[in-house]
């Protein structure tokens, strides 16, 4: 998510706030300094201007990204210092209570690599589910199939699989309508004389997807 975001009603704003002194300097940070979290997630009631800190700065309590699900809950990812679990998706109430893991990033059972869920879309007309993508193969950013994730049951439903492509093309992303339905996708040339020069767009019919 962005560094600040209004809730659906506009009554609350969530912000990532630095806990460090704002100093303008250029230096080479050590790895430990780069990994140390210096930001916390704060939700402020704009009607009363009362802030509430939702996260800390340690690996076990730090929030890395966030998006509003509704006026009561946010979807968050946690600090990457927690390992694979830093890529899992969680919900948390706007008052900082009831942190719940929705879906876990995990090792593939039969091959190397990890399976990582990414948020694709939150639709107010579908309050009980969100659209996510999950990588089908070991490379995290390739072959990311689309799923609905039920916020109550935590179960996923496959919507669309990345289709087979010519050897020189690589899948770039889905084209979705306002209901989260995939209508097309884009690719780019990764090999051959048009490498990096050609982007293609395809129509997609989820009814015929196998």
Task: Label every model-predicted segment.
Residues 1-210:
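Beta-propeller folds
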